[in-house]
Amino acid sequence: MEALQKQQAARLAQGVGPLAPACPLLPPQPPLPDHRTLQAPEGALGNVGAEEEEDAEEDEEKREEAGAEEEAAEESRPGAQGPSSPSSQPPGLHPHEWTYEEQFKQLYELDADPKRKEFLDDLFSFMQKRGTPVNRVPIMAKQVLDLYALFRLVTAKGGLVEVINRKVWREVTRGLSLPTTITSAAFTLRTQYMKYLYPYECETRALSSPGELQAAIDSNRREGRRQAYTATPLFGLAGPPPRGAQDPALGPGPAPPATQSSPGPAQGSTSGLPAHACAQLSPSPIKKEESGIPNPCLALPVGLALGPTREKLAPEEPPEKRAVLMGPMDPPRPCMPPSFLPRGKVPLREERLDGPLNLAGSGISSINMALEINGVVYTGVLFARRQPVPASQGPTNPAPPPSTGPPSSILP
């Protein structure tokens, strides 16, 4: 008994020290069903068991107290850091931790306009309630995009739809002090405005609707395609546009071939010329149409072939004078017949086609042609049709070239 009291006194003197020696006393306790079994026997053994149980309870209490002290010490250390961390404190306790001004400080400090803060707070609050919050500061040209100034500039010009229709994005770019060398500045500004500001414009100003915005974007896209098409000259020919009085179908495109059922002038061609009378600047279209031209169309009289065209141009002016006057006002026409070309412009061969149009028996396969209009020289090659001439038109045809056989074969 005295030995146990000495051990107890030694434990109390050590303070928290008895934590280690108390551990070996715990394992032998589980076999005991209850502490009442220790009180059943009367005598020294019962007193010893009761004292050991009391010692164990005291050790547990001391351990709990030590753990509570350690937790209090840990809480006292990060106490200064607690208010600064937004995750450990609810937003309601520290509202300044979650203001838009601190999250988007760069936007609020762009200038000292007193209405800037009010506008940005209202904008961010509206986007938050709408379900599309602004999560980052918009950047353009490596600098912060001023949403306040952009909204004021666009709404001052009538809203986003009006700016798109009038194409005044360059003025908006200058108003934002952005570099003028930005590529596709209009598209970038329109995209940023639609993402951050257009819903707010519809809510506060009601200058347009999403349907009108989509229609303006589609119209702008179609106009861009049309400008790209008209900016490319056909066949690379330079010259002023044709006069309004002339048929627009008389452009540089090749005329359609004549039909087989009509022996007269081609009715499908808007210029009134048969397909074989068109002088093409490139030989490829003629080669493609050789197989589709019937033989009777090759020997048509020039008067029938060129009559409608002479009536269209000017009945009171000669063809040569008309061709000279056509230079400064009309562009060159690939389908112009050779008889309308001014004299002196065909260096290799110059003759009027007063008889039937027949190049098959003349022995000439091609004619080089040069035409100067407004100081620009256009050159091309005319290819002949190599088909046999019908016998019925023999008397009206020019004399055939000498035969390739021996000279004695053509003597009487």
UniProtKB/Swiss-Prot annotation:
<feature type="region of interest" description="Disordered">
    <location>
        <begin position="1"/>
        <end position="96"/>
    </location>
</feature>
<feature type="region of interest" description="Disordered">
    <location>
        <begin position="388"/>
        <end position="412"/>
    </location>
</feature>
<keyword id="KW-0539">Nucleus</keyword>
<feature type="domain" description="REKLES">
    <location>
        <begin position="304"/>
        <end position="389"/>
    </location>
</feature>
<feature type="compositionally biased region" description="Polar residues">
    <location>
        <begin position="259"/>
        <end position="272"/>
    </location>
</feature>
<comment type="function">
    <text>Transcription factor involved in monocyte-to-macrophage differentiation. Forms a complex with NPM1 to translocate to the nucleus, acting as a transcription factor that promotes the expression of the genes involved in macrophage differentiation, such as STAT3, STAT1 and JUNB.</text>
</comment>
<keyword id="KW-0238">DNA-binding</keyword>
<feature type="region of interest" description="Disordered">
    <location>
        <begin position="232"/>
        <end position="278"/>
    </location>
</feature>
<dbReference type="GO" id="GO:0000981">
    <property type="term" value="F:DNA-binding transcription factor activity, RNA polymerase II-specific"/>
</dbReference>
<dbReference type="GO" id="GO:0005634">
    <property type="term" value="C:nucleus"/>
</dbReference>
<dbReference type="InterPro" id="IPR001606">
    <property type="entry name" value="ARID_dom"/>
</dbReference>
<keyword id="KW-0804">Transcription</keyword>
<feature type="compositionally biased region" description="Acidic residues">
    <location>
        <begin position="50"/>
        <end position="73"/>
    </location>
</feature>
<dbReference type="InterPro" id="IPR045147">
    <property type="entry name" value="ARI3A/B/C"/>
</dbReference>
<dbReference type="GO" id="GO:0045944">
    <property type="term" value="P:positive regulation of transcription by RNA polymerase II"/>
</dbReference>
<feature type="domain" description="ARID">
    <location>
        <begin position="113"/>
        <end position="205"/>
    </location>
</feature>
<dbReference type="Pfam" id="PF01388">
    <property type="entry name" value="ARID"/>
</dbReference>
<keyword id="KW-0805">Transcription regulation</keyword>
<feature type="compositionally biased region" description="Low complexity">
    <location>
        <begin position="78"/>
        <end position="87"/>
    </location>
</feature>
<dbReference type="GO" id="GO:0005737">
    <property type="term" value="C:cytoplasm"/>
</dbReference>
<dbReference type="InterPro" id="IPR023334">
    <property type="entry name" value="REKLES_domain"/>
</dbReference>
<feature type="compositionally biased region" description="Low complexity">
    <location>
        <begin position="1"/>
        <end position="23"/>
    </location>
</feature>
<dbReference type="GO" id="GO:0003677">
    <property type="term" value="F:DNA binding"/>
</dbReference>
<comment type="subunit">
    <text>Interacts (via REKLES DOMAIN) with NPM1; the interaction mediates ARID3C nuclear shuttling.</text>
</comment>
<dbReference type="GO" id="GO:0045121">
    <property type="term" value="C:membrane raft"/>
</dbReference>
<protein>
    <recommendedName>
        <fullName>AT-rich interactive domain-containing protein 3C</fullName>
    </recommendedName>
</protein>
<dbReference type="InterPro" id="IPR036431">
    <property type="entry name" value="ARID_dom_sf"/>
</dbReference>
<dbReference type="GO" id="GO:0003682">
    <property type="term" value="F:chromatin binding"/>
</dbReference>
<dbReference type="GO" id="GO:0006357">
    <property type="term" value="P:regulation of transcription by RNA polymerase II"/>
</dbReference>
<dbReference type="GO" id="GO:0030225">
    <property type="term" value="P:macrophage differentiation"/>
</dbReference>
